[in-house]
């Protein structure tokens, strides 16, 4: 809701209140999600911002907070219990379910016990990837009920195929609530459908409410309208499919949409490399299998973090960077983003398992320090800083400090919203996707479709056409012709090139706390000079030598390709 409202420039705070109002009138409580230390974002949040989060959302009409820590570190969850109670909300604390030698029934029951003792009002069994084994899940629920007869809610995704059996098992063990979905967003990477779950539980002897089919069909129709408008442009048709291949890597359904979108960019990067070296191209399916295999390799070596936001993205991104590196003749672990290092080093919480020696050795070689204290201590309060910034910019803090909260939680996105850039970029992206959809070819046509690539030959770029299958040479003339591509204007400034190691978006800073580098500024070897954001992770680009920045060759927010010149240093 935040992202869409901000990008469209809508008055999101009014939308949230209007959304919760009819639920309250019908006696239905509303939920929100809280990533504990990470709040609503992919990186840690100061304690004062976390506390304001609860105050704002309760004022907007939210009743229950579902808090989870992607590492299952109760130290990150317990503060949210207090924030919820102070705000007058119900605290539902989550157990992030995964399947490993560490994540046993006893592990989860003990975690629930700690949360209940800390004051949790409810427990959520968050089976985010749908890979929890049905019988084990039933045992977890039964074990928790022995501690205290506390409300338990089961959340799962249908993709791997365990979902319906798991729902039956947890209900037989005493689960009170089940998360369900509705067509056309149920099944696949979503929840099991309401109609199917209701029919199954009714047959099993449970007392379940009847479904108002007229209302169901109306809501289903509204969802389809949203998808036909523009929402469907961001949802891969493959998300509807069941896929038992998801059992091994354990990646959650919630990130499969972004994964498939990222995969297209990653595949393009790999095949550009292969085209320059006259190597066979890789298919998307081949890359997907390599990624799944690499996730299975990486996951235990970085301590078995439960694969839920943001750590599912971290593990997936690390695996993808390894795959891309190895496909390009490089070694594993060559590029690890700072956020991923924070997870590895313990700054985001305690990892469930042990790190592999190769990871520890790399950290020591790079002079990185491990941390075993309270993760929140690494992130001091910042609300006063944002209050001052809003005052300087003459921005209203909003009703119940809503605007202040959004700025402190999402500084870059908020500034893009205020400038109008977010809306402009969003509408341009929707237009582009609609055009691509309108021009989409059939599968048979796509198989024989030609691709135009830019190939570098002895420093000179040439546009060439790569054809698949039997293609009439006459059709290639316009596209290829051995005419050099028009070279980009040479960037101002002298010195050595700082090249982008991957495709993504260029940023000088990743948050408002950092000061952007400028032309003329001196830098030392190892200094962070900019970032390339890819796959929801900011990858720090460091100076490889001492010197002075003579040129910055991209603007913040620009899309850059691998080997694009980002800066020049002399």
Locations of regions flagged by a protein language model:
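Core active-site phosphate/anionic-ligand binding loop and the adjoining beta-turn-alpha structural block
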Residues: 165, 190, 198-201, 205-280
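Hydrophobic, small-residue-rich alpha-helical packing segments that form membrane-like cores
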Residues: 17-26, 42-162
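Active-site loops and adjacent core secondary-structure elements that bind or stabilize anionic groups
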Residues: 11, 258, 262, 281, ...
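Flexible, low-complexity "carrier/transfer arms" centered on conserved reactive residues
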Residues: 314-321, 326-519, 525
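Structured functional modules or segments
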Residues: 489-570
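Single conserved hydrophobic/aromatic residue that forms the stacking wall/gate
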Residues: 1-8, 12
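Glycine-rich phosphate-binding active-site loops on the catalytic face of alpha/beta enzymes
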Residues: 127, 173-190
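Conserved, mostly hydrophobic/aromatic
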Residues: 67, 123, 174, 197, ...
